[in-house]
């Protein structure tokens, strides 16, 4: 069974997934970040593939991607770095990146490399669901790579149900239609969106991302889904500390989490 399915199989709550950009802050630090996050009890990790035009991301992640590219990170190098990661890392790993570099690499080759490295899923924010269905789904399923689709408050109920029916892993609930970045709390409109999706009784578990930056937003996400995805706040801490151990320790303090709260 795919590790994403294994994670959600027992209907867990309060899951923490962390996003970081491969090759940032240092080119060779990718596997160190992964191992450090797992050691601290993080349940799932999203590894960002740096791209020059990350349209769904705010300035924090854009700047990290720019620096990672300057450092020399590429998709080919990332797969080389991840080749032996499954010798000791057990939690689900997901690659998150834009369609352009993945298509240049070749989608079949990309999925094959994911399978060989033990990557469990992929998030491609600019992949239309129709294109996924017609051109990508068969290839991804051949390699047991879960393609995680995003929904926003603007996504129609019909499309949400289509995504729920034709994907298998989890649904990424974007907290707003804006780019990634910190929010102090979720307003009534966002909370109504969470409740609307909850009432749809979807078969797939849900994770909330975009804007999770403190204990209030983390708890609100966990109340309305299986857990939260944190990106910009962790990348900011990684920028400040230049050390994944210190960065995740600070993040857990901000979220008021101990290692016992995770897993």
From Swiss-Prot:
Reaction catalyzed: (1S,2R)-1-C-(indol-3-yl)glycerol 3-phosphate + L-serine = D-glyceraldehyde 3-phosphate + L-tryptophan + H2O
Q: Which InterPro entries match?
A: Aldolase_TIM, RibuloseP-bd_barrel, Trp_synthase_alpha_AS, Trp_synthase_suA
| Key words of the record | Amino-acid biosynthesis, Aromatic amino acid biosynthesis, Lyase, Tryptophan biosynthesis
Q: Does the keyword GTP-binding apply?
A: no
Which CDD domains does the UniProt record give?
Answer: Tryptophan_synthase_alpha (cd04724)
Top-level class of the enzyme under EC nomenclature: lyase
Which pathway, per its entry?
Answer: Amino-acid biosynthesis; L-tryptophan biosynthesis; L-tryptophan from chorismate: step 5/5
Q: What is its EC number?
A: 4.2.1.20
Cell division as a keyword of this entry, yes or no, is no
- What assembly does the database describe for this protein? Tetramer of two alpha and two beta chains.
Q: Which PANTHER family match?
A: TRYPTOPHAN SYNTHASE ALPHA CHAIN, CHLOROPLASTIC, TRYPTOPHAN SYNTHASE, ALPHA CHAIN
Record family assignment? Belongs to the TrpA family.
Q: What's the name of the protein?
A: Tryptophan synthase alpha chain
Q: Which species is this record about?
A: Bacteroides fragilis (strain ATCC 25285 / DSM 2151 / CCUG 4856 / JCM 11019 / LMG 10263 / NCTC 9343 / Onslow / VPI 2553 / EN-2)
């Amino acid at each position: 069974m795919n590790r994403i399915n294994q994670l959600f199989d027992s209907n867990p709550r309060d899951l923490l997934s962390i996003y970081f950009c491969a090759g940032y802050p240092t080119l060779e630090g990718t596997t160190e970040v992964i191992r450090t996050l797992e050691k601290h009890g993080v349940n799932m990790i999203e590894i960002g593939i740096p791209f020059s035009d990350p349209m769904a991301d705010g300035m924090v992640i854009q700047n990290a991607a720019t620096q990672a590219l300057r450092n020399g990170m590429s998709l080919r190098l990332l797969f080389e770095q991840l080749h032996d990661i499954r010798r000791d890392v057990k939690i689900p790993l997901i690659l998150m990146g834009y369609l352009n570099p993945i298509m240049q690499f070749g989608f079949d080759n990309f999925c094959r490399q994911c399978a060989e490295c033990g990557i469990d899923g992929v998030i491609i924010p600019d992949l239309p669901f129709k294109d996924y269905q017609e051109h990508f789904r068969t290839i991804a399923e051949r390699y047991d790579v879960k393609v995680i689709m995003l929904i926003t408050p603007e996504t129609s109920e019909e499309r949400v149900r289509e995504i729920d029916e034709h994907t298998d892993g989890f649904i990424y609930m974007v907290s707003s239609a804006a780019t990634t970045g910190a929010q102090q709390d979720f307003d009534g409109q966002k909370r109504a969106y969470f409740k609307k999706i909850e009432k749809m009784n979807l078969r797939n578990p849900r994770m909330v991302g975009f804007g999770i930056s403190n204990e209030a937003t983390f708890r609100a996400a966990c109340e309305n889904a299986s857990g939260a995805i944190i990106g910009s706040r962790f990348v900011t801490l990684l920028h400040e500390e230049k050390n994944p151990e210190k960065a995740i320790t600070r993040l857990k303090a901000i979220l008021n989490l101990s290692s016992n709260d995770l897993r």
